């Protein structure tokens, strides 16, 4: 058991490492791709050589980021087979479909048109080149769609049926998987956060060049485009985040409770805006969960259910199976103890089904199919030793959520301010306080990355211990490998990905420092 725990923890750590490194490149690809396409559209409309130079500058940075992002993403898909082979077998028919479409359709689409985008200047018509640029940007979004649909299915399994004869889940509705509320909100929330990062990146880099008194006209134009895309992105990110909260409240109430550090729910539940958790607080005790808190009255009920008087269950309520309607009447839900018992019944029925199949007992198989279907939705709970095993890391989820919301709120104010200054203060670089604004813009780049990664920490840590919500826990999904193997590959990936990140930053900084946009004006 100890070795299993070590393997699970190290495999989770390895996947978190590679996923976070990969995510450092993905949102910039999503956001910068759209910005470059818009800039080239302006160039084609105006025929201005200055817009051409500006387009090529940002396109160069896009290409550097895209190349490193592809390199970091390849390893992720292989990890499902090496470290999580039971999961791959259990849901491969479903989970593999969107990933296969992403690889065959979206990635090849990006790879084909990015070649035209970079090497087609002067070789294809301007309109065809613009089309290639837009298709590259759209291809990146389509690529994200399939990956995010797969991730959403892990958190809210729909559109499938379990086949006890093959011990695998089989797809019955592809559209249900792709169009589930969880998938739709996750896609738009993630892509719009990429637009936000792309906009902030353009504004921040432009402000760095303004600090150096270089390429002033180009930077001021870039700031306008970046600020518009960033503002649209952050507003839509917040809007889709609201929808995501509702789906989480419905399908993953334990995650919502962990996000709030909420142990005992109430009708008209307050939302903790700022708070410090009590590290001594345990499930079932009477200690105050917070050392300090500033709350918004009824905010969590509004966020979770769009109803200020609705009941939001806490961790103790969810474990005990307690809930209440808006009029205060108790609503029966299934306690975690009962879920564990039903999970064991499903597990036992599966074993008996396998034995009946070997003996050719079709009558027993028919009866066992009914039992399996009755309890299958709780199969994952069979692997839990106690109900508390289903509680995610509360401090990490709680604080990550507040980091995400806090920085996101700052970015909204910053981008709106940037838009105002870009149009009302056309000679922004000459203002006496401009240096402070430029430095704030530069600092906003890493802050946006922290915000983005924090969102993924909430999404992934908050759903633990499930790799497939309620159906399969991490311990059930793990491959039969040694902890030493995972530790070795973890160290290799850590060194490799760190080297790639350093290379990416170094190349980008070198290009930003040395590239004079005027030198690109006459480039064809």
Please state what every model-predicted region is.
Residues 1-20, 47-54, 78-100, 152-188, ...:
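Membrane-interface interhelical loops and short amphipathic "cap" helices
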Residues 2-45, 53-57, 62-69:
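N-terminal signal-anchor module of multipass membrane proteins
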Residues 46-64, 90-96, 100, 120-138, ...:
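Membrane-interfacial loop-to-helix junctions in multi-pass inner-membrane proteins
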Residues 63-71, 134-154, 230-241, 356, ...:
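Hydrophobic alpha-helical membrane-insertion segments
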Residues 65-135, 152, 461-463:
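Membrane-interface helix-loop-helix modules in multi-pass inner-membrane proteins
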Residues 115-123, 128-134, 145-154, 174, ...:
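Internal alpha-helical transmembrane segments
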Residues 150, 232-348:
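Aromatic-rich transmembrane-lumenal/periplasmic boundary elements in polytopic membrane proteins
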Residues 389-456, 487-511:
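C-terminal substrate/ligand-recognition segments
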């Amino acid at each position: 058991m100890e070795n299993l725990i070590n393997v699970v923890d190290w495999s989770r750590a390895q996947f978190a490492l590679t996923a976070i490194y990969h995510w450092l490149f993905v949102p910039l690809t999503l956001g910068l791709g759209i910005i470059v396409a818009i800039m080239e559209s302006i160039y084609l409309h105006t025929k201005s050589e200055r817009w051409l130079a500006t387009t090529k500058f940002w396109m160069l940075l896009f290409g550097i980021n895209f190349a490193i992002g592809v390199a970091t993403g390849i390893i992720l898909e292989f990890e499902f087979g090496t470290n999580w082979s039971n999961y791959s077998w259990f849901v491969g028919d479903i989970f593999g479909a969107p990933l296969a479409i992403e690889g065959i359709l979206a990635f090849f689409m990006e790879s084909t048109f990015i070649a035209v985008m970079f090497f087609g200047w002067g070789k294809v018509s301007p309109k065809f080149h613009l089309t290639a640029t837009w298709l590259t940007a759209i291809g990146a979004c389509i690529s994200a769609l399939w990956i995010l649909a797969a991730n959403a299915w892990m958190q809210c399994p729909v559109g499938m049926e379990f086949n006890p004869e093959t011990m695998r889940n089989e797809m019955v509705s592809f559209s249900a998987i792709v169009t589930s509320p969880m998938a739709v909100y996750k896609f738009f929330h993630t892509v719009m956060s990429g637009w936000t990062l792309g906009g902030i990146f353009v504004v921040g880099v432009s402000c760095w060049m303004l600090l150096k008194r270089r390429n002033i006209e180009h930077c001021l134009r870039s700031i306008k485009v970046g600020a518009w895309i960033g503002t649209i992105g952050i507003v839509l990110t917040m809007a889709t985040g609201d929808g995501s909260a509702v789906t989480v409240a419905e399908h993953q109430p334990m995650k919502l409770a962990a996000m709030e550090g909420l142990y005992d729910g109430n009708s008209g539940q307050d939302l903790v805006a700022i708070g410090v958790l009590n590290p001594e607080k345990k499930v079932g005790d009477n200690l105050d969960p917070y050392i300090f808190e500033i709350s918004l009255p009824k905010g969590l009920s509004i966020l979770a259910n769009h109803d200020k008087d609705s009941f939001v269950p806490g961790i103790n309520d969810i474990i005990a199976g307690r809930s209440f309607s808006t009029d205060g009447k108790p609503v029966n839900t299934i306690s975690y103890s009962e879920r564990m018992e039903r999970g064991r019944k499903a597990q036992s029925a599966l074993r008996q089904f396998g034995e009946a199949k070997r003996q050719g007992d079709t009558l027993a198989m028919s009866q066992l199919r009914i039992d399996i279907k009755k309890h299958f939705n709780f199969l994952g709970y069979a692997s839990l030793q106690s109900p508390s095993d289903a509680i995610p890391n509360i401090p990490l989820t709680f604080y990550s959520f507040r980091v995400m919301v806090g920085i996101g709120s700052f970015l909204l104010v910053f981008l709106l301010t940037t838009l105002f200054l870009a149009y009302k203060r056309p000679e922004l670089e000459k203002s006496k306080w401009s240096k402070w604004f430029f430095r704030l813009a530069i600092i906003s780049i890493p802050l946006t990355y922290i915000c983005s990664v924090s969102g993924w920490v909430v999404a992934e840590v908050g759903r633990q211990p499930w790799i497939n919500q309620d159906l399969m826990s991490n311990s059930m999904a793990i491959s039969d490998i040694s902890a030493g193997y995972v530790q070795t590959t973890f160290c290799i990936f850590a060194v490799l990905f760190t080297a790639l990140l350093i290379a990416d930053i170094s190349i980008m900084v070198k290009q930003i420092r040395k590239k004079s946009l005027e030198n690109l004006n006459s480039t064809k």
